[in-house]
Amino acid sequence: MSIFFSIRFWPAAISAAILWLPQVLGRSNGTAPNYTVEELWKLETTFWDNFLYPANVEQMEAINSTLFTQDVQGRVDITRVFNGSELNTEYIFGLFSDPDHVSLVGVPVDYSITQFIAQGNIASATTVVTFNATSFGNLLVPVTIDTWIMWDADGRIMQYDATFRWFGFLLDTLVEALAESINGTTSQATASLTQLLATTICATHDQYCTGANQQYDNNTACLDFLTSAIPLGKDYELGRNTLLCREVHEHMVQYDPALHCPHIGPTGGDYCVDDQTYAQKVLQKYFNQSWIVGVPSTGDIWLGD
């Protein structure tokens, strides 16, 4: 596989960039900051610089990343919504920060912004992120992520909306790579992936979900539920009652067992549940600020009540 990237950045400058951004950016017009396009580009690239491994480890260890406001709102199409800086720090940075742990896509190692337009305090971009899928023989996979990001006057992300483009194709590619590595069929690879993810989740449960946080009676009950009672999940079901959803949340259990253990348990907590129809997901009222710029936002059905 040959992948070419036109934009490269150096992690050594990341911390310094974070420190000076709030001081020089974000001239406010009294309602929302009015950045130049160049300033918004710098804010955009600063986020992606910190998204890459190992810079994301430093962000994760901060607990509450300074890249987010305390009440940040985030939505990811294949999963769900995420509220607050601590939760977003865990999911945005912690989810992809351990190359030695079993995961679907591994760790992000490079990126190229291929589309970008910005105005005021909002930028819309398409970013192709290269992940090292360490659980699939260090397979390098390009993942396309479309984002809308809004910043406050201090250069912190106050809300974002992210879409993983062609994610179903990505899942099929990973399964095919696994099938090739085991010299088996895609059905056999899917079964192998199911067993691998379930075994990892149950090991995490046994280690961290103890006492009041225990979700399964024992390891066998955990494996039986994850491999038999729920489906692996489709590409849009990483926020529903599936194994793939629990794979996402398994990475977070170590940081806050009381919060995240229910997400990998039989109930799914508030995240791995089938509580939305298609229409309810599409029409969900969520964001505090409208993404519409320059014209009245009357009729914006995504604005929260």
UniProtKB/Swiss-Prot annotation:
Keywords: Glycoprotein, Signal. This is Aurasperone B biosynthesis cluster protein A. Belongs to the bfoA family. Part of the gene cluster that mediates the biosynthesis of aurasperone B, a dimeric gamma-naphthopyrone. The first step in the biosynthesis of aurasperone B is the production of gamma-naphthopyrone precursor YWA1 by the non-reducing polyketide synthase albA, via condensation of one acetyl-CoA starter unit with 6 malonyl-CoA units. Glycans are attached at N29, N34, N64, N83, N132, N183, N218, N288. The keyword Glycoprotein applies. Residues 1-26 form the signal peptide.
